[in-house]
Amino acid sequence: MPKGYWTIWTTVALDLVGFGIIVPILGRYAERFGASGLTVGFLFASFSLAQLLCAPLLGRLSDRIGRKPVIVISLVGTAVGSFVTGAAGVLWLLFAGRIIDGASGGSLSVAQAAVADLAPEAERPRLIGMLGAAFGVGFVLGPAIGGLSALGGPHVPFYVAGVLASINAIAAVIRLPETHHPGDRAAHRGLVAPASPILRRLAVVSFITVAAFTAFEATFSLFGDRRFGLTEASSAAVFLGVGLVLVVIQGGAYGRLVHRFGTSGCSPSGSACWWLDSASPRLPRSGRC
């Protein structure tokens, strides 16, 4: 295992725990401000749009000044966004908090670049797959922490997420290794041309996958409430189940599957699972499923 890998992994996992605290409760929280289902969708979209616009800039900045400072900046932005969301008294401040969080949400992509800096080429799929298991940890611990902290009031989970991001930023300053060194940018330029067909196809697949998962995040708590009468705790339990599956697949099975079938063999099966996930909510008609 490359030196510094587990520090990077822990930083990402803690960041995603904060994300997991917020996601299951955000829709219901927004309804307290009079938000409709459509407005909740726009709220999630505002985070994603800010991330879409700013993540490439953060990636380029990490090439110039290093991975570590950009990850720290992202974590500080996440803390600020979480505190603003928790302190919001009106809907526009809720949007402002999510936009701040999204604009600074480049920690995962920069962390993946840091792992690519550290890892030998043959080990990159396995190590980046293990980094993906941090999503699972976030969705296991985050909803549980969010559900418990919500007992103190609807604003409390966002403050908890903000405190966690602040602690994570301080720990990153102290512990996170710098993996990007002078000359690396020039050395790696041209490995894949920006307009290459391979990169375009990967970008399209990635966009569709992230869009599907974001739609699930944005709508599930409202869908579960209105169709099955799920409480916030019940919705959090579903996200916890998603997290457990992510930990098993990304943390253990992914490396073996890629070794046996290759990335091109694993991608279609993953897409098929997403399709089943999207279709399955239409099947049950009661709380029993």
For every predicted segment, state its role.
Residues 131-173:
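Helix-loop-helix hairpin linking two adjacent transmembrane segments in secondary transporters
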Residues 52-89:
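Conserved MFS/SLC helix-loop-helix module at the cytosolic interface between two early adjacent transmembrane helices
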Residues 25-37, 219-234:
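Short amphipathic helix-loop junctions that connect adjacent transmembrane helices
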